[in-house]
Amino acid sequence: HAACLDMVYGDYDVIRFYGKHAMERNLERTHLGHGTLSFGSRRGTSSHQYNPAVILAQRDTTENAGDCYGMLFVYSGNFSCEAEKDQINQTRLLMGLSDELFSYPLAAGETFTVPEVIMSYSADGFSQLSHQYHTCISEHVCRSRFAHEVRPVLINSWEAAYFDFTGDTIVDLAKEAASLGIDMVVMDDGWFGKRDDDNSSLGDWFVNEKKLGGTLSELIDRVHAQGVKFGIWIEPEMVNEDSNLYREHPDWAIQIPGKLPVRSRNQLILDFSRKEVRDNIFDQICAVFDQGKIDYVKWDMNRSMADVYAGNLAYDYVLGVYDFMERLVTRY
């Protein structure tokens, strides 16, 4: 585990945050009786099913009064959180990597560094704890120039049109957005390959100019001419079996050797623990981004990891995603 907090006395509640699609981070407060309360993720992501955060609070703690201790795990993959009250009423709180399906062999002299946990304490209730976390994250974790900027209000083409759009309908959406004071239009899934439904083309990151009725550069200029910013959707970690990429490199999808892969939303996950896989997708994405002034990127991930073929896969996969993101941020 990355963090361990021992309390020699006290009677505590555990607060964690569960969720599902379109209903993330619901607060659940439970009295910690004798035994162990645990939650986490085995999905390959930190997940909105169970958020990698926990609060240990005195039973009478409120928004504005009382003791509370927070832990935030600064990591995007599998995790485990445990709270235990033992037979002599001591309490222990643990947060870190999940050890289920996890092993990481080290050669002589090699080291392994676990991700960090941000811990915070408040004697003045949950609001103060929240403010402390806000300050810490904005000052010391967020490093982009946007850390202290007001976020733009955006409208997304997905709920407006799903896959059924053209360049003209995106521009019409931009005109309507401008009239309502909306700052940005995001062109969602469906702009690439032969992507008119969710059965094909993930992994083939080239602009479908026939669908857009012109080049991406022309569309971006038309949207900007309406006085709004332009954003674009990507799902770089995923691949459809009906794609040029999969036909050329079926071994790039995560699967257990000798077994059929598990599909979800008609897609498989690319093995981002492998540099050659990341490099290919990075080059494709950059060839798109270089075509015009893109203001915003929506990075999607629409399925969880199932075919874990090795104990180090999930961890190395997350590091691969971080490497990919770092390269994008550095380049743009």
Where are these regions (language model features)?
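Short Pro-Gly-centered flexible turn/kink motifs
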Residues: Y104-A123
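Aromatic- and glycine-enriched glycan-recognition loops and surfaces
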Residues: S157, A161-R247, A253-I254, D279-N280, ...
